[in-house]
Amino acid sequence: VNDKKPAPKRGNNKPSVQNNAVERPGLSARQCAARLLGAVIEKNTSLDGLTDNSHGHPQYLALEPRDRALVRAILGASLRNRGAIERAISKRLDRPLPENAVALKHLLHVAVAQIFYLNLPDHSAVDLAVEAANADPRNRKYAGLVNALLRRLSRNKERALAHTLLPEGNVPEWFAKSIVDAYGAEKAAAIFAMHAYEPPIDFTVKSDPELWAEKLGGIALPNGSVRVQTVEGALTDLPGFAEGDWWVQDVAASLPARLMGDINGKRVADLCAAPGGKTAQLVQQGADVTALDMSENRLKRLRGNLERLGYEAKTVATNLMDFAPEELFDAVLLDAPCSSTGTVRRHPDVPWTKTPQDITKLADLQGKLLAHAATLVKPGGVIVFSNCSLHPLEGEEMARKAAENPLLEPFPITVDDCAGLEGLITSEGYLRSTPADLPPERFNGDPHRAGMDGFFAARFKRRA
């Protein structure tokens, strides 16, 4: 982004926000970032929805692709380091900002995220923040404060960073407490530390992982996934995309479909299937797959993904609770809707858009879905339940409660089911991963290549 155009003369205080955005490249991106940060923090709006390239926020859609990428980078840094940024700001203020200066707080967070965490000129972050303040009637009177505060932080960046919070301070207090309660202080600290880094990209490949690791410039993981730290350019330009030789899927997300046993030639249902990564795995394992999802649009995406891979599956757009097939399945996979708290590395808005009440409601829904899933399987058939939540209410506690269902017999997962990642199997026979698994020590200390999504899986058999 070219941020070097001279600022308007002091006497020119009449241009609208829109005119300023035209006059000063980079301004509209910063204004958009502050606006979207407010939507996440104040209204619990999903960042994915706000930055969707088809249906996102109008202010975001009005930007050029390069500025959209900048907005996403700013928001990622702002949310991953929210507590650290807040502390850095508050320590350098003589008095707290007024409670109603909400727009100002978002503007400052966006600017400090650039100064501390992005490879952008500090002076651009400062100048554009001041200009954005002047362009907004709510913030105009604080323009001098914005200028002084940000210049002070940019001059003493290293000192400011050294005094910021520990990683657990970058998520809401309830979220931090729930993770500490579930995993203990040491494991929780490792999880929070991994939240600070964008995740690498994992691929599920159809053939030789070592070969594809070489072709894609990555490494083969113990389970056969291929990991690449970053991809320059579009995924669609990578070797093997057009040929359907691989699909993107976090290593943790690839594990539940591998717990089904021998499903070659068997009828298997993927009950919450879109976007289709697990569906593709089931087809790859030789199953006759029926993929369900409530959303026809999401199923359309799934069918497109399978078509690229050269795979086929029956698709059914329906609410799972209404699904009553004429013939029962040999096995079902229920990757249930959840709080997604295991995906904070790739979705840093999750701690701010989810609440404890959401987790309770989702756990209740999961219990109902799992109970119904049990009715869709032949006696002796396998049911795998999974989700990408870190919270025991949606995982271990859910599985223990499900075991009380007279149709569900626990079928413990063993180390043989998870070759190479045996440490993820718990003493109760569940699969539990966290972002702290596959730690940096396994990658020469590099956190950018480490970690995995938080996932839970439990396996059952249908009682006769």
Model-derived regions: residue spans:
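S-adenosylmethionine
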Residues: 1-464
